[in-house]
Amino acid sequence: MFQLRRLQYEDVEWIFDACQDETIQRWTLIPRPYSFEDAAWFIENEPEYVTMVIEDSESSMPLGLVSIHDIDEITREAPMGYWIAPWGRGMKAASAAVKLLIATITPDENIHSVIAYIAEENTASRRTIERAGFVEVEREWGMAREFLNEVMAIKYRKTL
């Protein structure tokens, strides 16, 4: 089982370690190279609407992050993202965390739906978001990155 909690400064070390992973660097927009200072800045400034640490509920071991990036005031769509550290993969932590995050933000009259743009080639993340109840709504070029290069993205939506 999994739980979510707010970021704490003590998370800086494991976030730094996790973000050295090639898979995280491949599919996210983190700086490259990723420094300890980058991790500290992210925690201190928390640039997202909400960011939560995904933890194993028995051991409290941090496994990854899940976040709502912002809220579009016109469409009331809330783009989200997530990543799982190498030591947390294969446990379905991300799909559980997506469901937990949606339960945490609901009800919020400012959010009509949560969306995720996932690179077409990122099959693991596509399975994750589908397990969390999202449905494919369209495909757009350039809304996702692979090693910072624009690629075809699939837009997924879950209406609240």
Q: Language-model segments: what does each one mean?
A:
Residues 34-38, 46-47, 84-85:
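Juxtamembrane/interface motifs at transmembrane-helix termini
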Residues 9-16, 36, 40, 44:
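An amphipathic alpha-helix signature
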Residues 43-53, 64:
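A short helix-loop-beta-strand connector motif used in the catalytic cores of GNAT acetyltransferases and
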Residues 38-41, 47, 128, 151:
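A generic membrane alpha-helix/interface feature
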Residues 1-21, 55-160:
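Acyl-donor (CoA/ACP) binding surface of acyl/acetyltransferases
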Residues 23-42:
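Conserved GNAT-fold acetyl-CoA-binding loop/helix
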Residues 23, 32, 47-48, 133, ...:
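Residue-level detector of secondary-structure transition/capping positions
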